[in-house]
Structures are given as structure tokens and as C-alpha cells.
Amino acid sequence: MTIRHLSETIINQIAAGEVIERPASVIKELVENAIDAGATRIEVVTAGGGKTLLRVTDNGSGIPADELALAVSRHCTSKLTDDVHDIRALGFRGEALPSIGSVSKLTLKSRPQDADSGFEVCVTGGHLDGPRPTALNRGTIVEVRDLFYATPARLKFMKTDRAEATAITDVVKRIGIAFPHIRFSLAGTDRTPFEMPATGTGAKATLERIGQVLGREFGENALAIDAERDGVRLAGFVGIPSFNRGNALHQFAYVNGRPVRDKQIFGALRGAYSDVIARDRHPVAVLFLTLDPALVDVNVHPAKADVRFRDPGLVRGLIVGAIKQALAQSGIRPATSGAEAMLQAFRAEGFGAQQSAPRPANSYSPASWRTAPPAPRSEWSPQTAHPAHRPLDLQAAPALRENGQAVLGDVAVPAADARASVAEAPVELMQKPLGAARAQIHENYIVAQTEDSLVIVDQHAAHERLVYEALKNALHARPIAGQMLLIPEIVDLPEEDAQRLAGHAETLARFGLGVEQFGPGAIAVRETPAMLGEMNVQQLIRDLADEIAEHDTADGLKAMLHHVAATMACHGSVRSGRRLKPEEMNALLRDMEATPGSGTCNHGRPTYIELKLTDIERLFGRR
């Protein structure tokens, strides 16, 4: 076969196959161009899921008439000169418009801010017509009709009109979060009109824009993030652990304002929440990374969806550290969705619709809501109604010991705060975040009262988190005990992996794993963590080598140790079915208030829910 040059049309169609996957890809490119042009209003109109019509209108700087033909030519751009590593615009390759024009019927109309009239060019299947004068307000309109008409095979891979319209909406929302000062609107015959009014600049405006996309509930359950390390700044908002979702669709990441789906960023996000949410749940987060363009390569993916950091370990450490710090400092804060779910459950059961029944003799009256409850028949006498806090009478679990020896040494199980005064009244306790314990129901749930809410605590889940945090603190406070192997295990690795792993020998030794290089392509394992018991050493070393090669960290071993600690905590916690004394219940509440991450157990389930008095009044039809 003869080698020959491809035609310009075929070249553009090949490029379109890389850049333009679906109608949403077209909208992404056109909206980014509008943002680069300094637009403050961007309107998107679609029909037929974008396959029939796509139109983007903006009030940006516009394109001069003599540059319109260049705008639809390959590799013609105003955003890049000679430094491909200093990219500050969303678009820079000059491929979007010619690629779109090669597979559709494209019309480009523009009028610069200082021009008296507008001009337009048309591109049909790669063939240019114009420019010619046209009536137009200042700004630019790009209209795309019959997408993929020139490559009908691509239409077979399109989804339904509704699915494509939804994808377009998602793209506009994702871009819009990063630019709250721009007003976005979507309309068309295939959708319900949607608008995101401009909210301004700054963190407050960004949170308001995020609320337009994710709903007001996110703002009520969000923690602000703002950290910087070695010239890389991380800002944004993350949800508290109990505010999570069943998929990762509500995770947004931006690098220098560019929406990305980078596995390193989202991997770090998962790592930051690994201890506080269940494995099958996903945190809600909006993260903005700002750094020197020379420190990140955005030219590694045709659609610029992925990036490559010069120092991925720095970025991962910044994300994990900043989020963990924010979670630790958030204190006691339940998700607002928990109370709403409870109210919905009551409504679903018809609660409140039944005829009022006679009030039992021992029930509370409205006037008694903020007063001490009557003493039960057992364990609560007038002398113990307002006790001092005393330590929980709990022993370390059998799982903490092996052959009579403490695996982690003398790890103290969280105890109550014994500093509370004997004279401390329930009124003072009710001012605390989790309030004063009022009762224990079904020997598993603690009912507490604050000044304006009712709190229900799962005693096993709560104490499990307290014990787990104590064990983790013990792990980090001193080196982990190791057990020597009678015969060292030799693990064959690629030479580079072996060298990298040996370079982390000191860090691994703190976790009870003794390794040293054994020749150019092998690692000798002489000691393993005692608390892990029997293990697959070969698989562990290979997993660590892969992790160090990718992230330059050995967090996998730490995660394994934490998993064992979580199992110990589960078995070493106060069990369901155990009756607690009032002082023990109050002690548990105080320890929860002082422990980071106590809103969820080790498995990610909530340890407590809170019903505001206003919620209860709504439940009974008082609001």
C-alpha cells in the first residue's frame, strides 16, 4: 500500500473522534472558549439531545472578521505562543472548532466589543463559506446542527436524547461551579430550562454556586478547606462524613479552574475519608487546586480531562492532610439529612395521621420537655439523678491480647471525663453538643437532650469509634511490635521497585515490617507486624512496591494495621444489650464530643442522629 498524505477533512474527522465523543463534548469546548473570551453571560440551547442543535451564546470579547476563518482552522489559537508548559487558558490547541466543523454544520457568528457590526462563517463537513456580514449583538454565537452527519457511524453510539441532554447539563454544571461570577442558562426543546445566576467571587459566592448545583443541603453539611504547601494551594468544600452518597457523581475537582477527573485527586479524597465512611459510600466534595502551570501537564488527554502533576506525592499529601484536619476540627456535627430521613420514615408510616390516644400516666407532658424526667423503677434514684462522670467499667477486649501478652502494649480504652463536678446539673449538660443523657432504650440506644434538640446515640457504634481512635493513637505513638521470621522471606521485584522499597525501610520499620535489599532485584523480609499474624508476605511487599512507585508512600501497610485495629475495636466495645448507668451514658457522650470522627463508627455508619425541636414540632403538626 502506498503511503500518502491524508486530506484536511479526514485529519479533522480523526481529531474530532478524539475530542468530540458526544454532544456534551461540543458544549464543553464551546463553553470553555466563551470563558476564555471573558464572558459573564453564557446561554446554551439544545434540541434532540444535542444531535439536532447545539447553540452557545456569550457576551465575551468576540472575534474580528478577519480572524473568523482562522478560528475554524486547525492549530490556530490566540491562547498559546511558544511555551506549551505555561498554559493559563482552558483551551489552547486550536482543534475544537475545526474538529466540530468537520463532522457537523457549524455557523460561527461574532462581533467584537469595539466593532460596529458582526460577521459569520459557515463550515459544512469541513468546507468553509464566508465570512459575510450579519446582524448580531456584541459577543459570539456558535451554532452546531446535525452533529456527526458526516460520520453517521458515530450516531449509532449515541444514547437517548434524554441521556445526552442530561450529560450536557452535567457538563455545564461542572464548569459553572468553578466560575460563580458567570451567569449560565440552559434551554431547549429537549429539557426543562435551567439557570445558574451569577453569585460573585470569593468563598461565599462559590459555596452559593455549589448550592445551585448540589442543593442547599450541601451547604448545611459542608466543611471549608483552605491549605497550601510548597506553592500548591487547595481550597473548596467537603461534606461531613455522615453526609455521603451511593456513587461518586457528587465529587468535583478543578486544577487551575479546569474541571478534571484525575484518579490521583479522587484517590486522595477516598483516602482522606477511608476511616469515617463505609466502603460502598462516597464523600461529597468540591476541590480547587491552584498551582504554577509549569508544575502540571494538562496536555496528556485529548479532552483535557486528565492531568499529570510533577510531584503527585505532594498533591496527595496536601489533599489527605487538609481534609483530615478539617474533619478532625469539625467537632460534633450530624448530617441534616439524618433528621429528614427520620421524619420521612415517620410520615411513610402514617405517623401523626392516627387519632390521638390517651396519654400514658408515665409519659411526659409538653411542660416537662425541658425538665428532668421522672426516675425509673431501677438504677435511677434521686441520689443518682445528677451524678458525676465516672469511667466506663470496660476492660480491654480479648482480641487485644495474644497468648496472654498485649499485642499493642497497655492501650487504654477511652474512659469518661472524671473532671465533671458532682454538682453539675442536667441544665448545664444540655448546653453541651450532645446534651444530657435521659434514658437508654432497648439497652442499645442512648436518648439525650440538648437545649434545642433530641439526640439518639448507638452506644456500640459510638464506643467502637472511641476505642478505634485510642488504638490508632497507640499505633502512632510508638513503633509497632514486630515478630522475627525464622527464615527471611525473599521477594523478587524489578530492580527499580526494590530500590524504592528499600529507601522506605525506616518508615516500614516503625510499622513492624523489617526489610532490606537482597541483591539488585530482591527484598529480604526479616520481620512482620505482630498484630497482623499470619500473612501473605509476598503479596504485601508487591502491593507496597506498587504503591510506592505510584504515590511514593507506604500507606497500604498503615491501612492494614488500621483495619486490624478496627476489628479489635469492634470486639472491644460496649456491646448492644448492655444496660448503662446514667453516669456511663453521660461519660460516653463527653468522650464522643472530645474525639475526632465520632460521628461515624469504623464501618461508616452514623453513631448518632439529632432531631431539632423544630423537627419534632413539624412531626406533630405544630409547624
From Swiss-Prot:
Q: Say yes or no: keyword DNA repair present.
A: yes
Q: Give one Pfam hit by family name.
A: HATPase_c_3
Q: Which PROSITE patterns match?
A: DNA_MISMATCH_REPAIR_1 (PS00058)
Q: Which Gene3D superfamilies match?
A: 3.30.230.10, Histidine kinase-like ATPase, C-terminal domain, MutL, C-terminal domain, dimerisation subdomain, MutL, C-terminal domain, regulatory subdomain
* Disulphide linkage map: none
Checking InterPro entries in the record gives: DNA_mismatch_repair_CS, DNA_mismatch_repair_MutL, DNA_mismatch_S5_2-like, HATPase_C_sf, MutL/Mlh/PMS, MutL/Mlh/Pms-like, MutL_C, MutL_C_dimsub
Alphabetical keyword list: DNA damage, DNA repair
Renumbered residue ranges of the record's region Disordered: 353-389
Gene Ontology BP terms: mismatch repair
For this protein, what is any one GO molecular function term?
ATP-dependent DNA damage sensor activity
State where composition is biased (Polar residues): 353-368
Q: Which PANTHER family match?
A: DNA MISMATCH REPAIR PROTEIN MLH, PMS, MUTL, DNA MISMATCH REPAIR PROTEIN MLH1
Q: What does this protein do?
A: This protein is involved in the repair of mismatches in DNA. It is required for dam-dependent methyl-directed DNA mismatch repair. May act as a 'molecular matchmaker', a protein that promotes the formation of a stable complex between two or more DNA-binding proteins in an ATP-dependent manner without itself being part of a final effector complex.
* Similarity-based family: Belongs to the DNA mismatch repair MutL/HexB family.
Q: What is this protein called?
A: DNA mismatch repair protein MutL
Species this chain originates from: Brucella canis (strain ATCC 23365 / NCTC 10854 / RM-666)
Lineage summary? Bacteria, Pseudomonadati, Pseudomonadota, Alphaproteobacteria, Hyphomicrobiales
